[in-house]
């Protein structure tokens, strides 16, 4: 008969395979998958499972990372982003909508698909940047915007996007924004994701 693990060993295994457990894992490659042989967990993110919205967003972030990451690639930046985003979801200082927008913008930037928000896409000017075009993948100055379809955004929203794109992941969640900036940021990311990320994330069915 097949030997069964003891209840204590089973409890350890369950804790190590908690969906939000972060730590160091030792694995060996089986025929069709990797098998965990040892784990040293630093953070279980237990608070996430107590909040349905936070948990559904955390699952979305993990699903997003799984979609973008490639096996045997160096995906440390995405892993760092997941970790910091989970921490932000547990912090009541940050709205979940802001955490989602920050995660999405940083994740697509890590993947090389982020927008250009530091200079006009047409004339390369760095002043009077106020018009964002999803289809063109970036920002335009007031003069060049006359020939482009898109939306006007505030300086504060542009600064926020520049900060998210350029700041190391470890310092990413260190700010809050006004309702107006959050509204614009959410609108941009909703349209940008719909245009560039062609995937139906199942976990979003809960959070919306």
Give names to the regions the model predicted.
Residues 92, 96-208:
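C-terminal, charged interaction/regulatory segments at domain termini
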Residues 11-23:
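Short nucleic-acid-contacting surface segments enriched for D/E, G, S/T with interspersed K/R
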């Amino acid at each position: 008969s097949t030997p069964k693990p003891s209840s204590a060993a089973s409890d350890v295994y369950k804790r190590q395979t908690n969906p939000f457990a972060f730590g160091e894992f030792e694995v060996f490659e089986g025929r069709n998958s990797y098998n965990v042989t040892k784990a040293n967990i630093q953070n279980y993110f237990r608070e996430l499972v107590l909040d349905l919205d936070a948990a559904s967003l955390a699952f979305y972030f993990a699903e997003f990372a799984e979609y973008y990451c490639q096996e045997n690639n160096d995906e440390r930046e995405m892993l760092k982003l997941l970790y910091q985003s989970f921490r932000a979801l547990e912090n009541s200082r940050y709205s979940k909508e802001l955490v989602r927008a920050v995660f999405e913008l940083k994740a697509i930037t890590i993947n090389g698909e982020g927008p250009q928000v530091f200079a006009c896409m047409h004339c390369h000017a760095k002043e009077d940047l106020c018009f964002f075009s999803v289809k063109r993948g970036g920002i335009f100055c007031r003069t060049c915007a006359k020939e482009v379809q898109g939306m006007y955004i505030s300086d504060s929203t542009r600064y926020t996007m520049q900060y998210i794109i350029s700041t190391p992941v470890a310092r990413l969640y260190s700010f809050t924004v006004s309702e107006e900036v959050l509204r614009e940021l959410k609108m941009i990311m909703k349209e940008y994701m719909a245009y560039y990320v062609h995937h139906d994330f199942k976990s979003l069915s809960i959070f919306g």
